[in-house]
């Protein structure tokens, strides 16, 4: 779309149109999406763990709608009068390749609560990972970091001295996730943050595991206090980690969709398609048909 349209005037001025910053033909969110998808598909195979972080909630200690296990014909009944028992949020750190979850129910999740919790969890996790024993020069080390900023229009500045890259962290593009103190701490411990684009929280697999945990813990229940909700969430997380399910980005369903898309036949003049090719009459046959019609 042109940044300065010549048609459709707006009163005494020109009509406004949406333009993109810089000299780009594509959305600026594309590189962020591609980096996160590449991390999900290839990083673990290269020995680089990928973690996702998110905060779920707040969830109120009130009767929660949803299905519940009840005898047939005896639905669960919640009181129509109740007292609000406060709210709970769930801090979640998730490793999709193994399915393991580190979670902490809290009353609220400002930076003063989130940052120390995340630092403690990452410190404990990094201590369990195999350390890098092969000496690597500074140029190779920086290249391993900068490859995860490839194509970004506004990448954050990496420190001058970088340790070996040990993990990737996918989380939302929030101001509290970009404080200089936290970003410097992550880089100092070998963790590269990957931020989801605006409106791209669906790229964070922590959203999926949180939905599963919360649905199992409180949907269809009637918690009366925040402590009760915290106990339920903690128990569900403990049960999940007893037999975790690994997550895979895309998977067989995405491959089937891609094969179905490849089998389609695009139509000219629109974005439509057909599932089988349309028979086209050759030019020679068409000319003979027109000639015969004129002769008759």
Where are the language model's segments positioned?
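Active-site proximal helix-loop segment of RNase H-like, two-metal nucleases, encompassing DDE(D)
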Residues: 101, 192, 206-228, 239-241
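Extended, low-complexity cationic-aromatic segments
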Residues: 30-131, 139-145, 256, 260
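RNase H-like polynucleotidyl transferase catalytic core
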Residues: 76-82, 188-205, 221-223
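Conserved short alpha-helical interface segments
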Residues: 1-23, 49, 55-58
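Acidic/histidine-rich, metal-coordinating catalytic segments
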Residues: 131-152, 164-177
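Short, aromatic/basic amphipathic alpha-helical patches
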Residues: 179-187
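C-terminal domain-tail junction helix/linker
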Residues: 25, 231-296
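Short beta-strand segments
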Residues: 51-53, 167-172, 194-197, 248-251
């Amino acid at each position: 779309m042109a940044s300065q349209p010549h048609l459709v005037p707006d009163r005494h001025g020109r009509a406004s149109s949406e333009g993109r910053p810089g000299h780009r033909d594509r959305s600026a969110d594309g590189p962020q999406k591609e980096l996160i998808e590449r991390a999900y598909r290839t990083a673990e195979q290269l020995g680089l763990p990928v973690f996702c972080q998110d905060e779920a909630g707040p969830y109120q200690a009130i009767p929660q709608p949803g299905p519940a296990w009840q005898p047939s014909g005896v639905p669960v009944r919640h009181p129509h009068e109740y007292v609000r028992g406060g709210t709970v949020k769930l801090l979640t750190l998730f490793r999709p390749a193994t399915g393991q979850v580190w979670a902490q129910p809290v009353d609220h999740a400002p930076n003063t609560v989130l940052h120390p919790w995340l630092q403690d969890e990452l410190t404990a996790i990094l201590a369990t990972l195999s350390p890098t024993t092969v000496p690597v020069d500074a140029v190779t080390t920086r290249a391993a970091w900068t490859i995860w900023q490839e194509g970004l229009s506004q990448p954050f500045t990496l420190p001058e001295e970088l340790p070996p890259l040990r993990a990737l962290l996918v989380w939302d593009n929030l101001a509290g996730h970009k404080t200089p103190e936290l970003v410097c701490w992550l880089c100092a411990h070998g963790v590269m943050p990957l931020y989801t684009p605006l409106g791209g929280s669906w790229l964070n697999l922590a959203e999926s595991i949180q939905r599963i945990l919360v649905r199992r813990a409180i949907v269809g229940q009637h918690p009366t206090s925040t402590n009760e909700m915290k106990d339920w969430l903690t128990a569900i997380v403990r049960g999940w980690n007893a037999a975790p399910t690994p997550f895979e980005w895309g998977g067989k369903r995405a491959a089937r969709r891609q094969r179905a898309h490849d089998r389609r036949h695009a139509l000219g003049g629109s974005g439509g398609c057909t599932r089988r090719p349309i028979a086209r009459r050759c030019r020679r046959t068409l000319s003979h048909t027109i000639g015969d019609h004129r002769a008759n």
